Design a protein with these regions (language model features):
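Conserved anion/nucleotide-ligand pocket segment
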Residues: 221-238
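A long amphipathic alpha-helix within ATP-dependent nucleotide-binding catalytic cores
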Residues: 263, 271, 305-354, 392-417
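Intrinsically disordered, low-structural-confidence terminal and linker regions
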Residues: 1-30
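ATP-dependent carboxylate/phosphate-activation module, predominantly the ATP-grasp catalytic core
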Residues: 271-276, 281-333, 338, 362-389
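Conserved N-proximal alpha/beta basic substrate-recognition cap immediately N-terminal to
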Residues: 72-76, 88-209
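Conserved ATP-binding module of the ATP-grasp superfamily
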Residues: 194-196, 219-225, 242-274
Length: 482
């Protein structure tokens, strides 16, 4: 796209992103210069921090079985950063993987590893517990390096305070506000943006009314999703196709409120739309309020859990233009509420071909964010790509050298060749961080498949899946490879 669009008077100008590299555009918008040095922090699922103090769905407590795996997604930031940037990680990246990327011509950042690491903590909390790392980050701050986190919570504010690093993102309170699903529905109502039929619930009374209406629709055959305001990746969501389940949920919520004396609630209730294709589109809100539409990708999801993207989307040009125009309106509204940064919006194409342009707004880095520099380097014009995650069942750590031997000719030898670009090995071996006593554990391999056409892409994906499955192993004893 080359059309420049203006959605209102300056500074709320929306442009479609041109050929300047994504990282340079991001730095220009958020740090004021395309070559501004940054410290990147992959604190994925920051929603868990935002959800603290919120009253959501009744749930069983305890740590997620996949928390250790999710926290090792910090390594995704490695390939978003440039050679003059810095990345903080929970553990040392695999040196053979770094050598492989270097041989492919990827300019890698300087890596700083936390001295204290707990599998169940985010990379931010590990960094805060690492005095030597804090001192080094303080030196970078004195040199003018700034902080770009996946998203800002109070922990990232604490890190900025402890090191002197200035964040290129807004404060935690603002970021939390604009990432609520309740906020998202209200924003769309205000702008007149079509969304799934639903209700934003701030009190138990709101929830009772919403569920009464939803139960009638479910009785007529509809399916309803009940979502926590800060649920993510399939957590904090109930899919309901029986009105009795809604009645049960209302009773549970009402009893809890009666016991606590607190009738606050932060959930949304939505009627599931008939879906042909999931979408994720992405825009950047600059510090000056300008909005740049970055891209739209087809999203691959299973049960509400992100699994990958197909790139580029196969939307017709008029629908891409419609999403670009809407990005300007959404971005301007976010800017008026004090937000600047990266934004991904989940949407879908209905079975009749019409767009449902907003399911939820994620005003933070998205999974779609992290593959853009790889696309720019490894996906030639006219080629197709698949950002993919492969579940693994392992009985011992799988180093990159072994992965390289296993996948062999399925890995590209240079940009412009078809193959799988491996994003990291942190999630592959995250389950091995605790004692296994010979038991198996779940891992996950993230990568970007590139090919000249869809048929080749499909064959390549199948070949990678088969090679990975050819490793002899049992089934995981706990957790899953979500």
């Amino acid at each position: 796209m080359t059309v420049e669009q203006v959605t209102g008077t300056a500074p709320h100008t929306t442009t479609t992103a041109g050929r300047e590299p994504f990282l340079a555009r991001t730095k220009r918008a958020l740090a004021g210069a395309p070559d501004a040095p940054l410290v990147l922090l992959g604190n994925v699922e920051v929603e868990d921090a935002w959800a603290v103090g919120e009253v959501g769905l009744p749930a069983v407590g305890g740590a997620s079985a996949t928390a250790a795996l999710v926290h090792r997604m910090d390594e995704l930031a490695l390939l978003l950063a440039g050679p003059h940037d810095h990345v903080v990680l929970k553990a040392e990246p695999d040196p053979d993987h770094l050598a492989h990327l270097d041989a492919l011509g990827v300019g890698l950042p300087t890596v700083h590893v936390a001295g204290s690491s707990d599998p169940l903590r985010t990379v931010t909390l590990d960094a805060l517990d690492s005095p030597a790392l804090l001192a080094r980050l303080g030196e970078l701050a004195a040199d003018g390096v700034r902080l770009l986190a996946h998203g800002t919570s109070s922990a990232e504010e604490d890190l900025a305070t402890a090191t002197g690093l200035r964040s290129v993102l807004p404060d935690a309170a603002t970021t939390k506000t604009v990432n609520s699903k309740v906020y998202s529905r209200g924003l769309c109502d205000e702008l007149g943006v079509e969304q799934a039929r639903g209700w934003a619930c701030r009190t138990v009374e709101d929830f009772e009314r919403a569920c009464a209406e939803a139960a009638r629709l479910v009785a007529d055959g509809a399916t309803v999703g009940v979502k926590d305001a800060y649920g993510v990746s399939g957590k904090g969501i109930l899919v309901v196709d029986d009105p009795r389940r809604l009645d049960q949920l209302v009773r549970m919520v009402a009893r809890r409120a009666a016991r606590s004396g607190d009738d606050r609630l932060a959930v949304v209730v939505e009627v599931w739309a008939d879906k042909a294709t999931d979408l994720n589109y992405h825009f950047t809100v600059g510090r000056d309020g300008s909005v740049a539409f970055d891209f739209v990708k087809e999203a691959i999801t299973e049960g509400g859990v992100h699994k990958g993207h197909r790139i580029p989307s196969r939307l017709p040009a008029d629908q891409v233009e419609a999403l670009a125009e809407l990005s300007g309106r959404l971005g301007a509204r976010l800017a008026s509420d004090g937000f600047h940064g990266l934004v991904g919006v989940d949407a879908l194409v209905r079975t009749d071909g019409r767009l449902l342009p907003v399911l939820e707004i994620n005003a933070r880095s998205n999974m779609s964010t992290y593959t853009v520099p790889l696309q720019e380097r490894f996906q030639p014009d006219g080629w197709v790509a698949l950002a993919r995650q492969y579940p693994l069942v392992l009985d011992a750590p799988l180093p990159f050298a072994a992965l390289h031997d296993l996948l062999g000719d399925l890995l590209p030898g240079a940009p412009g060749e078809a193959g799988l670009v491996v994003q990291g090995t942190g999630t592959v071996n995250a389950g091995a961080s605790g004692p296994t006593s010979g038991a198996t554990f779940a891992g996950r391999l993230h990568g970007l498949l590139v090919a000249p056409d869809d048929d080749t892409l499909t064959r390549l994906d199948r070949a990678v899946t088969e090679r990975l499955a050819s490793r002899p192993t049992g089934r995981p004893t706990e957790g899953d490879a979500r």
